[in-house]
Amino acid sequence: DWNTAFEAAGFKNAIIAKEWPNDPNMSLDDARYSVIRYLSSETENAYGPRIVDPRSGEIMESHICWYHNVMNLLKKWYMVQCGPLDKRARTMTFDDKLMGSLIQFVSSHEVGHSIGLRHNMAASSATPVEKLRDKAWVEANGHTVSIMDYARFNYVAQPEDRISEKGLFPRIGVYDKWAIQWGYRYRPEFKDPYKEKDVLRAEVTKKLRGDHRLWFVGDEGKGFDPRSQSEDLGDNNMKANEYGIKNLKRVMENILTWTAQPDGEYTDLTTIYNSVRAQHLKYTLQVQKNIGGRYTNNLPDLKVHDYLPRSLQKEAVEWLGRNLFVAPLWLYPDEVVSRTGVKPVDEIRDRQSSVVALLLAPGMLYNIYSTSLCSSESYALDDYLNDVFTAIWKPLNDPSELENNFRRQLHRTYLGFVEGMIKPSSKDGANANLAISRSDIQLFVEQHLDKIEESVKEQLAASKEGDLNYRHYAALLRNVQKIKEGYYGKDADTRSSDK
């Protein structure tokens, strides 16, 4: 696969793969030979290391290691992400052709490491989301510009798009070809490394100015820029993952059929079900990263650091409101839960609480507020708090009492984190950042507590006295008043947001 990239850089037959000969004088441990080595192991992974001469930077050799159970990992990825799109993925036993294609894609990624390329987790952000559903476009260009991203498969595509394997699998992309030219192209005209550096810098600047698909980010997806993330797709996480949720729902509708075992066991069902729920969590955390971060650019004509637009962050909060804070009960059908032993109430509660903790973390509020002071286009802190409140504090009128149970838990969790910011010494705020209590953020949080109190009073008045919801709102109101008394003292009862 990589030979096309090397041909563009001026080399033919740069990489040749041969079967290991039956020669007793050759050893896999011999540093003269670069090999793909099979490891009989339950580990679900593969890796491509390289040995480099520190004096010159020359890559001396590589042993790509292929654990046996990486095939199990590939099967889970492909069924969960592309089962609704490719009928070959609707069984626990993939045919040799499909598994061979999956192995080829991972092998190409590991070869990329062996020839010097790092992960580029920003590569997939160069593709507009709707292009991932354009059959002609995505089959011609691929769903990511680099196989060195963790872009896996095109989970954005929908069944009605009728996209083939060419538009679902990663491939050597335009970024990869550019990176090989940068690293390997022979430039005999240069004798002075300093002059070469100046010319190459000018060439790269010109190239990047005209083609942002060649952008590289080396943070392994662990920085503050939401464009650089592991296992995401497209230029908008919210739009992409909304499509991903649609496909996960299709997987759940068919999971019992696709994982059926003749012996009546449910080990395969449990394996795939765990992967579906893990995929949903990935979608959630990818969206959450679009809140409170910043863009980091090493592209010409752009600010090195720039703020995330308000609209993008607001879109992320609304996505979380739809797909997490309205409990994803579709992910826990009784016929699956009863066969796998998963505890929906515990898992949904823990996931919702974890994301609330991220949204109301002192560092998050500080980032949003400090950014708003520097840019009128960024998210104002009071707007942010109001939007998060709207996403979480939904009325307790859902036909499902289970959903109402989750909403009550969310109310209590939310109030607990607000208390932690009002009273940093409380159990929920023991580690609250001093930057909160010593800045104007404290005033915004106090104002927000007034909003919570007003909303709780309204819902309490609208509830039937003595029923569960009435007791819930009455308890919340008592807690709000205790928080105020502990912070403001005895005058808390007379204090009001409109006085």
Question: What residue spans do the PLM features occupy?
Answer:
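Catalytic Zn2+-binding segment of zinc metalloproteases
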Residues: V111-T127
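Metzincin-family zinc-dependent endopeptidase catalytic domain
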Residues: D1-S114, E139, H143, F153-V156, ...
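Generic structural "secondary-structure junction" signal
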Residues: Y38, P54, W66, H119, ...
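Conserved catalytic/binding loops enriched for acidic/polar residues
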Residues: S124-K499
